[in-house]
């Protein structure tokens, strides 16, 4: 299995849709249609993304891509030079210092269940949303 970064511009019913954020296009994964929403784990068994599409209109065949929406893309000292040159730290849920709109901002404003969980958590990786100066520190 190989992975690559992609930008998705898809036409469906005469409308063009763009994929925002960071994602992966995985070759030879053979996840079938209907599996959208399935979790994708990294080598450390941490959730890294959510499977959302097959890049064809039928079940995947050898060499075809399945698409994953990344939840986080850390850029730190362990990140390869190729990724560092093309990416900034990214976090779909918590944002980063350059993000103006992100999910936990909405959760805080509307006092959602997720925000209650954040407030009750002792995990500093998710508590940083309460700090005034949101940092870019993220885990892989």
UniProtKB/Swiss-Prot annotation:
GO terms for molecular function: ATP binding; RNA binding; RNA helicase activity. Transmembrane segments: none annotated. InterPro entries: Flavi_NS3_S7 (IPR001850), Uncharacterised_MG067 (IPR022381). Pfam families: Peptidase_S7. Belongs to the MG067/MG068/MG395 family. This is Uncharacterized protein MPN_580. It comes from Mycoplasma pneumoniae (strain ATCC 29342 / M129 / Subtype 1) (Mycoplasmoides pneumoniae).
